[in-house]
Amino acid sequence: VGFKAGVKDYKLTYYTPDYETKDTDILAAFRMTPQPGVPPEEAGAAVAAESSTGTWTTVWTDGLTSLDRYKGRCYHIEPVAGEENQYIAYVAYPLDLFEEGSVTNMFTSIVGNVFGFKALRALRLDDLRIPPAYSKTFQGPPHGIQVERDKLNKYGRPLLGCTIKPKLGLSAKNYGRAVYECLRGGLDFTKDDENVNSQPFMRWRDRFLFCAEAIYKAQPETGEIKGHYLNATAGTCEEMIKRAVFARELGVPIVMHDYLTGGFTANTSLAHYCRDNGLLLHIHRAMHAVIDRQKNHGIHFRVLAKALRMSGGDHIHSGTVVGKLEGERDITLGFVDLLRDDFIEKDRSRGIYFTQDWVSLPGVLPVASGGIHVWHMPALTEIFGDDSVLQFGGGTLGHPWGNAPGAVANRVALEACVQARNEGRDLAREGNEIIREPCKWSPELAAACEVWKEIKFEF
């Protein structure tokens, strides 16, 4: 075939409705809003081309490779019900296009260039199917849910956490004191805020030392294993690992990373270090809403969650369904299951476009955090189940009597909900009653119930 210069329609090469997807393909579901007058087939083909082998014009060097082997293919397009001029384009990518064990490379290919494309008004990556042939090239979470429970010796209930507030401005000593009080009161974990790194008012090394002191004081007093998510996020990967090494030397159980601002390369390095050195890894999703909040442009959080499970993390923030941050119940539970379970069936009502088989990749604990308090406990226990971390920042530290009583109130409320559920009671219907009963003998819980009885974040 002679080389023929010029510009030709993408759909001639990249729109292949009769393509049978392979088990090894990475599949993507894009929500496209084409510019007026651009047919959906051309738009879908353009997405497939620009995120794989294509460029805007025919090039001579195409003849030196096999496009059929390497090109992305738009294999199906369906209109979005109830939306004008919006379509779901399904694209299949051959596995050879991606470097093994690199979320960074996967995203650079699939979402790197195509979102600025002129033929599209908007584009959103709604879901990805990661084939086992690719997921097997990733270490994944350093430990996973079962190993974490075994390390902490905590079973049969959600774990309790608390973000230390005010997030910025405390000295290291006062910060450690707040950590101790929460852990002593009955929480399993306390947490550095995502923007606590190493600022002038509290350098990281001082914070690590005082938080370790708090842990080692609270553990013998409560007879429980405690942890504080020490945020190792830093300006360079080397500095981040240095902080993780110091945490390991202190003997603490868990460190933390902001995976989107820190970047997937840094996150994967840290996850490998954590597995090699027995540290749990808590992941915060700071910056996610910049990427995932728009309904028709960006990347849905379920894709960012899948990417995190591949890159590695033992906990990740995933919305609350009930607190101050946005999240719809079915959709949230869809990506919560994608984080925890081995095998998730396609279910469009939960936003899951593809059946996902993680094989043996460890699971991630979803963290519910943001504007939640004791009255939410029955709903949270019911929605998230045992394999979750419930994090009450203001809902602990805002207690009228202080941090430790705030922690007591949350632990009593949680234990009451778990017991009620195990006795077969209906948490959704009897939730308020289940919280009121222990108030009779727990003044801490009674005080918390009084303070937050009217608080709702309903918009």
From Swiss-Prot:
<keyword id="KW-0503">Monooxygenase</keyword>
<keyword id="KW-0150">Chloroplast</keyword>
<dbReference type="InterPro" id="IPR000685">
    <property type="entry name" value="RuBisCO_lsu_C"/>
</dbReference>
<dbReference type="InterPro" id="IPR017443">
    <property type="entry name" value="RuBisCO_lsu_fd_N"/>
</dbReference>
<feature type="modified residue" description="N6-carboxylysine">
    <location>
        <position position="191"/>
    </location>
</feature>
<dbReference type="InterPro" id="IPR033966">
    <property type="entry name" value="RuBisCO"/>
</dbReference>
<keyword id="KW-0120">Carbon dioxide fixation</keyword>
<dbReference type="GO" id="GO:0009853">
    <property type="term" value="P:photorespiration"/>
</dbReference>
<feature type="active site" description="Proton acceptor">
    <location>
        <position position="165"/>
    </location>
</feature>
<dbReference type="GO" id="GO:0016984">
    <property type="term" value="F:ribulose-bisphosphate carboxylase activity"/>
</dbReference>
<keyword id="KW-0456">Lyase</keyword>
<keyword id="KW-0460">Magnesium</keyword>
<keyword id="KW-0488">Methylation</keyword>
<keyword id="KW-1015">Disulfide bond</keyword>
<feature type="binding site" description="in homodimeric partner">
    <location>
        <position position="113"/>
    </location>
    <ligand>
        <name>substrate</name>
    </ligand>
</feature>
<feature type="binding site">
    <location>
        <position position="167"/>
    </location>
    <ligand>
        <name>substrate</name>
    </ligand>
</feature>
<keyword id="KW-0934">Plastid</keyword>
<feature type="binding site">
    <location>
        <position position="194"/>
    </location>
    <ligand>
        <name>Mg(2+)</name>
    </ligand>
</feature>
<comment type="subunit">
    <text>Heterohexadecamer of 8 large chains and 8 small chains; disulfide-linked. The disulfide link is formed within the large subunit homodimers.</text>
</comment>
<comment type="similarity">
    <text>Belongs to the RuBisCO large chain family. Type I subfamily.</text>
</comment>
<keyword id="KW-0602">Photosynthesis</keyword>
<feature type="binding site" description="via carbamate group">
    <location>
        <position position="191"/>
    </location>
    <ligand>
        <name>Mg(2+)</name>
    </ligand>
</feature>
<feature type="binding site">
    <location>
        <position position="369"/>
    </location>
    <ligand>
        <name>substrate</name>
    </ligand>
</feature>
<keyword id="KW-0479">Metal-binding</keyword>
<dbReference type="InterPro" id="IPR020888">
    <property type="entry name" value="RuBisCO_lsuI"/>
</dbReference>
<feature type="binding site">
    <location>
        <position position="317"/>
    </location>
    <ligand>
        <name>substrate</name>
    </ligand>
</feature>
<keyword id="KW-0601">Photorespiration</keyword>
<dbReference type="GO" id="GO:0000287">
    <property type="term" value="F:magnesium ion binding"/>
</dbReference>
<feature type="binding site">
    <location>
        <position position="163"/>
    </location>
    <ligand>
        <name>substrate</name>
    </ligand>
</feature>
<keyword id="KW-0113">Calvin cycle</keyword>
<keyword id="KW-0560">Oxidoreductase</keyword>
<feature type="binding site">
    <location>
        <position position="285"/>
    </location>
    <ligand>
        <name>substrate</name>
    </ligand>
</feature>
<dbReference type="Pfam" id="PF02788">
    <property type="entry name" value="RuBisCO_large_N"/>
</dbReference>
<protein>
    <recommendedName>
        <fullName>Ribulose bisphosphate carboxylase large chain</fullName>
        <ecNumber>4.1.1.39</ecNumber>
    </recommendedName>
</protein>
<dbReference type="GO" id="GO:0004497">
    <property type="term" value="F:monooxygenase activity"/>
</dbReference>
<feature type="active site" description="Proton acceptor">
    <location>
        <position position="284"/>
    </location>
</feature>
<feature type="binding site">
    <location>
        <position position="193"/>
    </location>
    <ligand>
        <name>Mg(2+)</name>
    </ligand>
</feature>
<dbReference type="InterPro" id="IPR036422">
    <property type="entry name" value="RuBisCO_lsu_N_sf"/>
</dbReference>
<comment type="function">
    <text>RuBisCO catalyzes two reactions: the carboxylation of D-ribulose 1,5-bisphosphate, the primary event in carbon dioxide fixation, as well as the oxidative fragmentation of the pentose substrate in the photorespiration process. Both reactions occur simultaneously and in competition at the same active site.</text>
</comment>
<dbReference type="GO" id="GO:0019253">
    <property type="term" value="P:reductive pentose-phosphate cycle"/>
</dbReference>
<dbReference type="Pfam" id="PF00016">
    <property type="entry name" value="RuBisCO_large"/>
</dbReference>
<dbReference type="GO" id="GO:0009507">
    <property type="term" value="C:chloroplast"/>
</dbReference>
